[in-house]
């Protein structure tokens, strides 16, 4: 297997090429990319957890260090000023020496405000990309060159196409997340609370709560009907019925985003519905290929949802086509089939149709879909269908012409289980689709 160092060398070459093209197009000399800064809680001296600028960690796997700066021009070796203060109050990361440091010039930056004296004197034609525009102004960057939309759109568009280095990192993140999911299922089977299941997950993945790429969704029973449930009850419920876990991991700044759902019992209607959603999810992935719109796969899954609603007699006396046409599947799967994945969990450029940033919105019928792209080789996406029993979405259907088609008794029986979601992370290749999650044998 090719080493991470050689993959990274090629990755940097790709980023340099993209940078040259962007600088030429937008008539800039270089980009100054800021890792970010710590921000204190209001009226306090305690900072919020640091989250690095995604455009910064695209270049270097430095995710925990604020006040760092990258200068890139697409030609010369990228220059990294790495924040290295003399500080006995806080942990100070040492100057990095790793697989990637041969391809980047790494320079110690002892003072956060010392970058100004180290940058080129002529800065009028340098673009700043980062979260603190006032810092850029202090450095003499032109206001029009601070987070220039055209440059960011261009870089975002091409971030959709992962390099081999990025895919290698994402496969490592998958391994960590899969370990966590196995530990969490074991904790669920042993009767633990949501809080303790989360601890088991974090321990297995080697993450802190602030390290995971998004807040873990650890939902027992009816909590699985809350799409982004993050409360974490300390007390286990008296009766364990179901468990939905949506939790990821991060490796060198790249995310995994997996979801699994388990039934406490294997012989009830809910357990069969979990199995059927899983089977339909795999069947959809088996049809995926480059050159097809992601929207088409979302619509196709609503047809599969209709099939399951009919099979389980949740909707009766109506054809599957009529269910989809009249959006009776909508309240059961109110979110999109998935989203782009990469340096960010909901990765950028999901609606971008070209490198000029042309936007194609989600269909009006499915406004929460996060991607309208034609699938192309190098893209990484989640496929995460679900079926839920959410009263606020079902309530409008209790009246009107379609109410009689809903098996309300069956729905009431399933509501205590909350819902179901199954999520894998897939890579689009020229002639196949790689399922990174199932390749690790996560059922």
UniProtKB/Swiss-Prot annotation:
Signal peptide: none annotated. Mn(2+) 1 binds at residues 257, 339, 384, 423. Binds 2 manganese ions per subunit. GO terms for biological process: proteolysis. Mn(2+) 2 binds at residues 246, 257, 423. Its cofactor is Mn(2+). It comes from the Bacteria. Its EC number is 3.4.13.9. GO terms for cellular component: cytosol. Keywords: Dipeptidase, Hydrolase, Manganese, Metal-binding, Metalloprotease, Protease. GO terms for molecular function: aminopeptidase activity; metal ion binding; metalloexopeptidase activity; phosphoric triester hydrolase activity; proline dipeptidase activity. PROSITE patterns: PROLINE_PEPTIDASE (PS00491). It catalyses: Xaa-L-Pro dipeptide + H2O = an L-alpha-amino acid + L-proline. It is an enzyme of class 3 (hydrolase). InterPro entries: Creatin/AminoP/Spt16_N (IPR029149), Creatinase/aminopeptidase-like (IPR036005), PepQ_N (IPR048819), Pept_M24 (IPR000994), Peptidase_M24B_aminopep-P_CS (IPR001131), X-Pro_dipept-like (IPR052433), X_Pro_dipept (IPR022846). CDD domains: Prolidase (cd01087). Pfam families: PepQ_N (PF21216), Peptidase_M24 (PF00557). Belongs to the peptidase M24B family. Bacterial-type prolidase subfamily. Splits dipeptides with a prolyl residue in the C-terminal position. This is Xaa-Pro dipeptidase. The lineage of its organism: Bacteria, Pseudomonadati, Pseudomonadota, Gammaproteobacteria, Enterobacterales.
């Amino acid at each position: 297997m090719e080493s991470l160092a050689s993959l990274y060398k090629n990755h940097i070459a790709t980023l340099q090429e993209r940078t040259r093209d962007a600088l030429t197009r937008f008539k800039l000399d270089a980009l100054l990319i800021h890792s970010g800064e710590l921000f204190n809680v209001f009226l306090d001296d305690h900072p919020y957890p640091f989250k690095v600028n995604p455009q910064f960690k695209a270049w270097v796997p430095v995710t925990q260090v604020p006040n760092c700066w990258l200068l890139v021009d697409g030609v010369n070796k990228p220059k990294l000023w790495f924040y290295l203060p003399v500080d006995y109050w806080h942990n100070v990361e040492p100057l990095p020496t790793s697989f990637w440091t041969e391809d980047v010039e790494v320079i110690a930056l002892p003072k956060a405000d010392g970058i100004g004296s180290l940058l080129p004197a002529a800065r009028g034609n340098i673009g700043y990309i980062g979260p603190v525009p006032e810092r850029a102004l202090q450095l003499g960057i032109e206001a029009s060159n601070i987070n220039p939309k055209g440059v960011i759109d261009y870089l975002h568009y091409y971030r959709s196409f992962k390099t081999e280095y990025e895919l290698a990192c994402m496969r490592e993140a998958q391994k960590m997340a899969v370990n966590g999911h196995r530990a969490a299922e074991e904790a669920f089977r042993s009767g633990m609370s949501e809080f303790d299941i989360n601890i088991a997950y974090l321990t297995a993945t080697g993450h802190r709560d602030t390290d995971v790429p998004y807040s873990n969704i650890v939902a027992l029973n009816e909590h699985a009907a809350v799409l982004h449930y993050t409360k974490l009850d300390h007390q286990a419920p008296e009766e364990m019925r179901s468990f939905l876990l949506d939790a990821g991991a991060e490796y060198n700044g790249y995310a995994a985003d997996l979801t699994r759902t388990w039934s406490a019992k294997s012989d009830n209607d809910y357990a069969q519905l979990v199995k059927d959603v899983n089977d339909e999810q795999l069947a959809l992935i088996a049809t995926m290929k480059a050159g097809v719109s992601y929207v088409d796969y979302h619509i196709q899954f609503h047809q599969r949802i209709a099939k399951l609603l009919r099979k389980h007699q949740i909707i009766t006396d109506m054809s599957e086509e009529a269910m989809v046409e009249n959006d009776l599947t909508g309240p059961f799967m109110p979110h999109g089939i998935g989203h782009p994945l990469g340096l960010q969990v909901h990765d950028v450029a999901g609606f971008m149709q070209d490198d000029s940033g042309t936007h194609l919105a989600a269909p009006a019928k499915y406004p929460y879909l996060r991607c309208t792209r034609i699938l192309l080789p190098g893209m990484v996406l989640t496929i995460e269908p679900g079926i839920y029993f959410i009263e606020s979405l079902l309530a409008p259907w209790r009246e009107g012409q379609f109410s009689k088609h809903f098996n309300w008794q069956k729905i009431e029986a399933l509501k205590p289980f909350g819902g179901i979601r199954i999520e894998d992370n897939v890579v689009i290749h020229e002639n196949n689709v790689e399922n990174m999650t199932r390749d690790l044998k996560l059922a």
